[in-house]
Amino acid sequence: MHCPFCDTEETKVIDSRLVSDGYQVRRRRECGHCHERFTTFEMAELIIPKIIKTDGTREPFNEDKLRSGIQHALEKRPVSADDVEKAINHIILQLRATGEREVPSKLVGKLAMNELKKLDKVAYIRFASVYLSFDDIDQFTIEIEKLKD
């Protein structure tokens, strides 16, 4: 690593520690040329795939959009904010785990439905009715019957 003081490449790590609950490494470094010390931070760069919308356009994954849809389905339901965040983080983890640069928006919808099914069945039906475009009562009945199994 280049020294920020004299720009030489002669630096060595003199101390390393985990920070941010183990998601970052803090390193103290010393320049072998000017002997100045400085701190660097390292963290894994995990990329969330882009979303391929149903019309074929592509857009960056939008965590706020996902959160809004899930919270809308959970409106006035007894689910904690902590549980919502865990569900969102689990969806993001699954998207990263695909290893793909792009994923269809349908995958995000399915992952959200799976998480909602675990959190609250009523919220799941609300979300499914919009996501699956229910247009009659029979579709609600079919989905509710699936939940009973």
From Swiss-Prot:
unnamed zinc finger locations on the chain:
3-34
- All copies of the ATP-cone domain together span 49-139
Could you state one GO biological process linked to this protein?
negative regulation of DNA-templated transcription
The protein's required cofactors: Zn(2+)
Q: Identify the InterPro entries for this entry.
A: ATP-cone_dom, NrdR-like_N, RNR_NrdR-like
In the record's cofactor note, how is the cofactor described as bound? Binds 1 zinc ion.
Molecular-function GO terms, alphabetical: ATP binding; double-stranded DNA binding; zinc ion binding
- This protein's superkingdom? Bacteria
What UniProt keywords apply to this chain's record, in alphabetical order? Answer: ATP-binding, DNA-binding, Metal-binding, Nucleotide-binding, Repressor, Transcription, Transcription regulation, Zinc, Zinc-finger
What is the purpose of this protein? Negatively regulates transcription of bacterial ribonucleotide reductase nrd genes and operons by binding to NrdR-boxes.
Tell me its family.
Answer: Belongs to the NrdR family.
Q: What is this protein called?
A: Transcriptional repressor NrdR
